[in-house]
């Protein structure tokens, strides 16, 4: 009588989640109040819980791997980028043969082939390509982004999905928690955001450093830094000479070499030192230093918070983790507080202080909205309701015909435009899927209305 040996693959698969069963099927002294130990908890993770991962780069690859191996059976991943050679040292779900292909699709294909208990659905699109109904299907959203604009946009989307009871309280069933991770070199952070209850991205916007932009007049006429020389060659000389007949490719050594040589010539002309091949690569590609071990640590922290929120087995982090392993290991967790004046989650018009409406032009207001650490907008469009009840578009750059029609308003003062103290402006911008309301607050009482 022959005896068939058991399938080692099936045995391994049945034992894979024994560690999770120890957590989810029995209670302990650190369990969250109200946690019910049951086999249904693991079943929920494997069959019902849907998690959206935004970004399939260094953090995203780690998050996909972690969540797939933690029992999550239904993952979606969004990424609009394609794979570059420079990604391969840390984005381990990709191979050299994947260069030029979609990050989301390659990452999903790798996980689906390697982890049979998990199904990953890829979306090779921008997050802005999806509407509210798409995001409502998920129990949690976890972000591994390198863009502040994208963070602010998804933050605004999750806030716009909140529903309110008749007494003004939030319907908790409409909350989709967001777990956000970020890294730069040996530093990183992870945070838990419960929209409407905890501090959101906008509440702590001043924690993000403003993006460095070099004025065109400076890089063209009075360069002082090696970065100015590189930007000049990249923006002006490349466009004018088009040396290779194709768009600039930051991964092409010929392109980088050409920019390096021209930037070196310009730096010598203005007696500027410090132009190196590596610096040219960093400026051209906007490289943020990335260390694989930092990505792994932050992704693990994020994945743990996803697990705790999905199963309610332990209290989630409250709510911001700092991580630094530059000199040893340093971590610190604190509770970021909601801002009463938050542009996104306060639900009240926010004051926009104006020193003198007779000298402050609309262009000054737009510059304030773009440069202020509080706002950090990209290309705001402004509309308002005038005294006669008619809605008026003050300025909108996104539509050519409207931009041309409203361009003359830029040089007019707020008084000349007929905007009074306390008037509300509706502002839309690429940083948010929904409009924000600002209320003009004049410091000067005398306004000359034209």
UniProtKB/Swiss-Prot annotation:
Entries under SUPFAM superfamilies matching the protein: Activating enzymes of the ubiquitin-like proteins
Keyword Metal-binding among UniProt keywords: no
Coiled coil: none
Catalytic site positions: 217
CDD domains for this protein: Uba3_RUB
Catalytic activity of the protein: ATP + [NEDD8 protein] + [E1 NEDD8-activating enzyme]-L-cysteine = AMP + diphosphate + [E1 NEDD8-activating enzyme]-S-[NEDD8 protein]-yl-L-cysteine
Binding site for ATP: 58-82
A GO cellular component annotation in the UniProt record: cytoplasm
InterPro entries: E2-binding, ThiF/MoeB/HesA, ThiF_NAD_FAD-bd, Ub_act_enz_dom_a_sf, Uba3_N, Ubiquitin-activating_enz, UBQ-activ_enz_E1_Cys_AS
Known partners and oligomeric status: Heterodimer of Uba3 and APP-BP1. Interacts with Nedd8 and UbcE2M.
Reported function: Catalytic subunit of the dimeric Uba3-APP-BP1 E1 enzyme. E1 activates Nedd8 by first adenylating its C-terminal glycine residue with ATP, thereafter linking this residue to the side chain of the catalytic cysteine, yielding a Nedd8-Uba3 thioester and free AMP. E1 finally transfers Nedd8 to the catalytic cysteine of UbcE2M. Required for Cul1 and Cul3 neddylation. Negatively regulates full-length ci stability and hedgehog signaling.
Protein name: Nedd8-activating enzyme E1 catalytic subunit
